[in-house]
Amino acid sequence: MEEVITIAQIVHRGTDILSLNNEEIEALVDEIRSTLKGSNDIKNIRLIDFLFTLKDFVNHVRAEQSKLPNLSMPMEAYIRQLLVNPDVIPIVSEKKKELRVRPSTRKEIFLINGTHLAVPAEVPIEIYGLKLRLKTFSPQCFMRMAEIGSFLPETLGYVASGANLTNFIRVFMKCVDQETWKKNGEGIVVTTKENIIQFTHQYIELYKFLRSGGHSWLINRLAEEMVHRKLDREDQGSHISSVIETEEIEPEENIKRVIFFLKELSTMYSVFPVFTSGYMPLLYDLYRAGYLEVLWNPVEQKFLQHAEQREKEQMILQQVDMKLTEVTTQARQYFKIMEEKIGRVQSDAIREILTMEGKVDDPNSILQEVIKACGKQEAELITTEYLNIKKQWELQEKNACAHLKLVKQLRSGLQYAESLKVLESIRVLYKEKNNTTNWNLCKACGFKLLCPHVDMLIQLQAAEASYDTMRTKLMKFSGINKEKENNQGLIYSYFCKICGEELAHFVQEDRTADVGVIGDLNSKLRIFIWQETMKACTFIHFGKLVDVKQFANIAVNVCLPLIYNIENIKKEEDYDPLTQLYAVIYIYAYILNLIYSSQKNKEFLTITIHGMKADSSLNAYVTFLLEKMTQQYSGIINQLSEITDQWIANNFREAFKKIIHQNGLQGLSVQDDTKVLLTEILLDPLYDYAATVARIDGSIPMHKPQTPKEAEYEFKTVIGRTPTELLSQKEFYDKIYTFKYRPDFTQLARLNDIYFQEESLRVWWGGRDEEKISTLIYLKAYELFLKYLQNAPNFNLELAEFKKYENAYGEQRALLAQQGFYNIFDPNTGRADQRTRLFEYKKLPISTLYDEKGLPHKWTIYVYKAIDSSQKPAEIEVSRKDVIKKIDNHYALADLRCSVCHVLQHEVGQLNIKKVQTALKASLEFNTFYAFYESRCPKGGLHDFQDKKCVKCGLFTYIIYDHLSQPELVHDYYNNYKDQYDKEKMSIHSIQMKKDIAVPSAETQPEPQQEPWTFDYGKIIKTAKILDISPAVIEAIGAMEGRSYADIKEGQGAPPPPTSMDDPRLMAVDSAVRIFLYNYNCLRHISTFNKPPMYIERLVKHLSYEEKEDLEKVLPNVVNEYHTTFKQLRVTDPASALLYSIEFLCISFLTLYEIKEPSWVVNIIREFALTELNTIIQSEKLLSKPGAFNFMIFGEDFVCSGEDSSMDDISAYSSPGLFGEDIIDQLDDPFSIEDVDISLDVLDNLAPQ
């Protein structure tokens, strides 16, 4: 606390800061700042920052001294408390008549002039770097409010006397109350309690509207909008400088500031804070949202301008997109009404016109085409129907019956007894008693009240009935019969046939409960049988539609008990390859029994194999299944060395007999095609998706079909055809997902997004099933917001208009669903985002991307037209950077112009497509031509550029990549060497074809049979003699780990030959061979490497480039058939595979070592072969036991000088020291286990469980 003592010495203990005048305060601040200058202590930094506000703080508190004449504040006590605990609250105490500091440990009520101001939740706020967690309107807060306004206790009003808040309220009042602004002029805007209440009310309405989250796309952008300049700290007298204080701001800028301010408010947890005075929410929201912090946060002016420009562009583009969306929705509705009321003939004709090549997608053109195709009476019919759809929704929206609140309480109740009481109140409103077949209607309003199954469900829950009991009793409301459908494996969930709500779940275990003989002893085997049976369906041909899951379930039930009865099968949770092979055999035997049974009993479903006739002999099927089994499961069979083809055939025969003996003739029941097809379609997620959307937009009734006629109408509306028509088309099964609505998939996605948002709200508000939110309320909300942006002074009228469309969910909840309305769309194109499954590629003419010269369009010129015809000029074309400077609200964006070809965007369909294609083809030809001659010269060799021009062929460097700046030079050079280019290109292609294509000889010779491999030990002896080592060392490659090197040289302690294809020795030797071959190929093809291995580059550094290219010709290819032979031996004979790899390594070494010509290659290839093989052997030696290896191979520096360098002593190499790098190296070694005690018990615990 030395800093406190220093300050106390300066200030003098007991000094009352309220007794100091302004000059004394400034001198005191300067003295303290100079004393603490250069201090890095965070508390001192906070204190220095806080001293900026000391004078204003004292002046504000001194203003309150008139009411509290004995008010005092000891400076030392204040500073000491500030340093100890920065989270403080200075408060005024009437009893002690002093200003004191206390920690903010509980909710405070700040008392000033007898007025209680209750304070909301804690919000951190930063005042010039001093972080205070203020829970009350402290003197600091009021002092800060003094900068942007004054709080007058006499009237409890908010007077805009401060410059910043004056301008802000002017802006805000411009938006919400134009009349008040004109009436009060440029003086004080809000002076009375009545004005404050009116002002606050307007603010709350606007705040609720934006708080709902529907315009987050704009608010997030505006979050970057900081409207105040950087604070000039050198001038302590002027604290805040506002942009709007000295400039005349356009209405659009004012609107952005309002929305930005509301964005700050939207971070709060509740709309209305707790307060005792009912007209103070604005002050609390200003405080809680941290708006003061925003004012004090310095922002660079350049960033401000960039943010403003970008925001203006986004707002302009958004206006265009919103208008497009509004017109598109109307056009879609018109189109659907036309299809339903007039017929599909005219709608199909319109669709053909709209999808013509070169036609721009314009919703206005859809409306025009629809009206044009109809007569006067038909047009009136469509318009009238469109208005009727709106009115139907308005009736539901205006419903304010008391039963809505009761249903909400019923579905959101937390206790069953409480819900039961509410149910009794609802039953009084039933129009009919004991109704169990349809909705219970409200006798007061006539709308749907409650589904009967919900009534029964509440009673069962209150009686604490079991889940099985509830499921059984609720089944009478199910639209699907459990007994008829349970064995087909199709139905897993049951839904109410009245309201569509889910009743119960039926999972897989419910339908296969009879498989309890074995239980879950081997769930892995059960899953294996099920999966392999499903795979077998790929080659099985069923005569009619079947449920393949049911087919697999039966296979599990049939095969699993028989497999467990086999004596030599382990009854363990982990199954070995033998168990898997038995499972495959029994699966194929089950398939054979189905085929055999279908031949014997014609009532069974015909089952055969793809490509085979149904009446084929049983032997033919057996042959096919055996071949299929041995091919597809060769990996399992190869792991079992004792398994032969005869063994598989014998067990397959036994399995077939057991299945026939246990099950007899077995077949799949022939199902009704109509029933199977309709069931699969109705349960398909895409059908449910399309039907849901069709209900939302009014194409089909909201309720589930009650009669066969309604069901057929729904099916035909969603799919586009009746079930009978579908069954007449055999290929339909592969095209289930072809819907009538597919051309309007984007619109469906929008409506579906609304639906799911509404569903979540429905659950939240108690599940009123009868009410659905229409498209209208969302379109109306956006229409309102657009009008608000365009005509802010009339916001009150628009808000009143919006009230007409507010439904029973409440305005805020309805708009909350709007949030996801456009989430899945690209805001720039208005179409589905490409990252979603809703995205579809649209066929566009090539002229929409390229102009007639083959250049891509650049839409960087904005074309604006005057809104008012009297405005001059009538049209303005500006670049993106000049939009803010030259465009005001008198102009609207009309089109975009390409800066390359100067065509308007809506005129791209008029470009000559053939010219575009020809130009693109020519551009591609030029690119290929000049890329070919980028470095090679058509005159031979490489280009010889001098002054950017090749002296041999005349090619200029600047036309290689730029074909447009000098078109004459480009064409002249191309025409001069086009023939040469064609010849060289064909020559290269012919050479490549000779390499890739083997030309058959005139006389076809039979391919020579590859002789079986036999081991040649002489190759190992010859290699060992050259290397001067024991042949046993070469034989031990891959098997030196943990063996003494002395034993290795003598051939003692060698492990037995490998018996598994996964033996690590096989992988080690194979890796050594691959490394040898890789490095050899690097040497052989070194001319093609930019950075070959370092030591290989050293071997050939003295060779010329031509000699390096010739290495590929003079050096032989030693790879041959190594990889193929090794893979075969590894599976069939692992021991031979190990010997083969070692022998191949020796053969490759000897082939290279014995090369004798050309002479300039001999030394290079011998050094390479010796280096490679020695490196492989030395790497293996590192794995042998310590003490048996000569570490001198690493050089003398590795061995400690003066120590015994014996090959048999481990102390021959130095251990890490105790200081410096030795310790660091030891700590950083990731493989060091010196200090780890690994016992056998630990290793046992690490074994897989």
Swiss-Prot record:
Protein's GO biological process: symbiont-mediated suppression of host cytoplasmic pattern recognition receptor signaling pathway via inhibition of IRF3 activity
Keywords tagged on the record: Host cytoplasm, Host-virus interaction, Inhibition of host innate immune response by virus, Inhibition of host IRF3 by virus, Inhibition of host RLR pathway by virus, Late protein, Viral immunoevasion, Virion
GO CC terms in record: host cell cytoplasm; virion component
Keyword Zinc-finger among record annotations: no
Subcellular location: Virion; Host cytoplasm
Record's note on what induces expression: Expressed in the late phase of the viral replicative cycle.
Origin: domain of life: Viruses
The family this protein is said to belong to: Belongs to the asfivirus M1249L family.
Subunit architecture: Interacts with the minor capsid protein p17 and with the hexon capsid protein p72 capsomers; these interactions form a rigid zipper structure that stabilizes the capsomers. Interacts with host IRF3.
Function comment: Together with the penton and the other minor capsid proteins (p17, p49), forms a complicated network immediately below the outer capsid shell, stabilizing the whole capsid. In addition, blocks IFN-beta transactivation mediated by the cGAS-STING pathway and regulates the transcriptional activity of IFN-beta. Mechanistically, suppresses the phosphorylation of host key adapter protein TBK1 and degrades host IRF3 in the cytoplasm.
UniProt protein name: Minor capsid protein M1249L
